[in-house]
Amino acid sequence: MKETKEELRQRIGEEAYQVTQNAATERAFTGKYDEFFEDGIYVDVVSGEPLFSSKDKYNSGCGWPAFTQPINNRMVTNHEDNSFGMHRVEVRSRQAQSHLGHVFNDGPQDRGGLRYCINSAALQFIPVAELDEKGYGEYKKLFD
């Protein structure tokens, strides 16, 4: 049975709900993963689909977690976003279609040149030590 909007809101919290379902943006430098650099993967807070690896995370200084690439390009979808008079590329999770943030072409050139600027509220971190028990064992190879 599909979760209702209210059940989802209760499960993930108000901020995560507003970010993932209504394309809100958390305030810069307030997210729990902005200055967080432990080894593990980041999954969609709504669906649990694997999105990003700490191996691709870097400190961009933008105030949100920044990644050079998703774990797999098929895990995210890009969408044109012309809101607020800006032209940006919105990033969503493929399965749940959760709003994650935006991707820009000002990332580290030696790592592909992209900066995935992602809201902490859209993510859940799974430490390497918990990958097996949480069902993400196949991603341990990223940390060998």
Curated annotation (Swiss-Prot):
Keyword Metal-binding on entry: no
Pfam families membership: SelR (PF01641)
Catalytic activity field: L-methionyl-[protein] + [thioredoxin]-disulfide + H2O = L-methionyl-(R)-S-oxide-[protein] + [thioredoxin]-dithiol
Swiss-Prot/TrEMBL GO biological process terms: protein repair; response to oxidative stress
GO molecular-function term, one example from the UniProt record: peptide-methionine (R)-S-oxide reductase activity
Keyword Cell inner membrane: no
Protein name, UniProt field: Peptide methionine sulfoxide reductase MsrB
Location of the active site: 117
MsrB domain span: 5-128
NCBIfam families tied to this protein: peptide-methionine (R)-S-oxide reductase MsrB
Enzyme Commission code(s) on record: 1.8.4.12
Species of origin: Ligilactobacillus salivarius (strain UCC118) (Lactobacillus salivarius)
Highest rank taxon of the organism: Bacteria
Keywords attached to this entry: Oxidoreductase
Cellular component GO terms held in the UniProt record: cytoplasm
UniProt similarity note: Belongs to the MsrB Met sulfoxide reductase family.
